[in-house]
Every structure is written in C-alpha cells, then in structure tokens.
Amino acid sequence: PKPDASSSVRGPFKSIETSVPGVRFSETLPLLAQRANRLAIIRSMNHDAAPIHETGQQLLQTGRLAIGGVKFPHWGSVVASQSATRMGIPSNAIVPAFLSNTGVSAYRGQEAGLLGSDWEPAAISAEIEGEPESIRRQYGDTDFGRMLLRSRQLVERGTRCVTVNLFDSLHQRSTWDCHGDPNCGPATLNDYQSKLCPDFDRALSGLLDDLAQRGLLDDTLVVATGEFGRTPNVNERLGRDHWTDCWSAVVAGGRVSGGNVIGASDSTASMPIDRPVDPGELTATMLDWCGANVESLSVTIDKTDLPLIPCQKLTELWS
C-alpha cells in the first residue's frame, strides 16, 4: 500500500500494521497481516511482455514465453519428469481446473509442452472428503478455501507440485481482473473489499496455519502471486487495469526468512526502484526447491541451445 500517495493511487482502502515492524498491508488482509512474520514479501515483480494475462501466465509457470510455437513446460511437469512417483499419486496437480478463457487464445503455461503428454499435469477437483468441520472453517467455506484445503491434502499424500487457479476463467465474473467493465472484467474494488480479499485472506492464512500445525510448513514452499499488477491509478469505474511494470508476491514455508521484504517500488507503485524481480526467478526458485537441476535444463530451437529457465533462483528468500 501507498498510504501517502494521492487518493487516486491509494484507492479506498487504508493500510494497517503487520506483525513485522515497518511493513504494512491493506486493511482488507488483516489475517495475513498478523502472519507477516511468516511471509517473504516481494514488492518488485515485473515483466516487459505484452500486458495480457497469457504472457504473465507463461512467464510465471514456465519461466519464458513460447518461441515459434514451441510450448515450454509447466514447472511442475519438469519436476515430475525428474522425480520418482508414487502409485496413484499425481506428481503435478492443477486445482481445480486448467486455465481456460482468460482473454486471448494463447498458451497459458499449464501444459507439459515439449516434454510430451506423459508429463501433463493432472486436474484435481476441489471436492473435500474426510476433513473435520473445524479444519474446513479454518480455511473458510469458500471456493478458494476448499481449493487450498484440497491442495494440503494432495501435498500430505505425496504430490510434489500443486498449482491452484483461483479462477479458471475471467470474463463475466467477479475476479481479481477488476476493470469495472461489465463487458470483460466486471469486478471493482468494492468486490475486493466484500469478497475477494476476505476469501483470500482467510484461505491462505488457514493453509499456513494448517501446514504449520501438521509439521509440513518447513518442507512446503507456498507462493501466492498474480500474473501481473494493476494500474497505479484507480479508473473512473472504481477498478484498476492491467499493469506489468510492478506488483507484489508472497512466499512462505520452505524455511524462507519470514518478515523479509525483497525489492521496493516508487511512490505510486508504478515501477521497481530496488531489486526488480522477474517472474522467471520465481519459476526457477520453485524448480530448485523441488530438486530440479535448473542449470542443466536446456532445449534446442532452430539449432540453438537455450536454457529452459533463463533465470536464477531468488536466493534473497533465504537471507
């Protein structure tokens, strides 16, 4: 948040203190604010590709953009291709469904791509069985709560990689894509306050608490991010439009340094002013955490050898 910026930048929400001195969150995330000491916060995510959903989806999940029709594999497919699997347990799961209508007919980064169909992710529904009511309440009786609870079940049973799509389709729905435009992204910041942020706040907090209570948090890397940010200025419809130049992400678990803040943005959250972070760095980090040898991965395109992931892992998460 930018509490000292003009009202057109800071929007309608106040900022609140967190459990980390000097770090502030939006008032719409009070539970995560209490758990900020468990989070590594990246304030300087950015990319310079086209400002559409599909480019960000590719960069975050494959580490690079498709080249000449070549689809680079989802990070979990890379891990699955290098890992032993347990009978009946998917190594790489997408919950609850693959991304579908996100605006443009283009690759969204959730396929095995050039690795081949043997390594396609498995789509797993968010149907929950065998959990006590107290645990369900911890995550919240919401779609996102059920998705994260299902993800915890998968991790506990041996799935190596889980990707949760809070929304598989964007149009004509109230999603993070808050243009305030009924023809594409109808949500506004009012929807952030009444539904989207409360659901996210409770579900992610519930997941972190549950993993910690089960002794799984140190061995599970949790990453929460979007594929880009939103415009620094609120538009005339009380929405914000696409913005690839700067956004935030959080990482927890995996023995990361809780309370750590990586990077910073300018006074209007328009651009990074310290330690810009490429989405591919998160991809490389997830691959490295799961034991994939990132530096050894390459692909030949038009007789040219290219690294599968052109970025290094984000070592500052552990400093």
Language model: regions and residue ranges:
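Ligand-binding pockets and gating/stacking loops
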Residues: 1-319
